[in-house]
Amino acid sequence: MRDTNSRYGNLPPRPPALLFQIVQKFYRGAVSHYPVIELAKEELRQAVFDWEACIETKNNDELEAEELVRKALTTLFLEFHFYVTCWLQIDLALHRLCTHPNGSVFCRLKQRFSDDIERHLAVRHCVDDTEACVSAQMEHTEGDLSQLANDSYWFDGRLFTVDTTSLHTLNELYRAIMEKRGSV
């Protein structure tokens, strides 16, 4: 798998038809994975709820409940990893489309969506080390795990989640790429 920091180095050339298939494949992968992410979020919320119940009742199972939160968070971040990897693959295909004759139209698209692409790829870089992300997230909550139920997670100095805004942006990017398919 490509490192996000040096992702464009030594990319082999690909014909445009294949690049559009790659975009389509990873777009579908990300979209179809969204319900899996929502389920993982719900499991995390339930684990946090159970942890809060342990705290309120001063139950001795607090450490066990915290471990269940950690496991649910790990699962969620693994699901995020798949989703943002799909963004990475779309970015790589878009970059290659920019290098084709008449590819300037794709360069403009890449520029238009660059902030969103880079935000997702920054998270992709972080979640390559899922355990470190989980530890950083647990540390960021400063012991108040109820913050995790807010669906906003800390990745290297930025808050991020996979939500309908992210999915909407992905839909816009996909449509924009496919609308320009006849350009190359």
Where are the regions that the model predicts?
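Amphipathic alpha-helical interface segments
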Residues: 1-116, 146-184
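Histidine-centered, metal-coordinating catalytic motifs and their short helical/loop contexts
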Residues: 114-138
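Short linear, low-complexity motifs centered on an aromatic residue
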Residues: 135-147
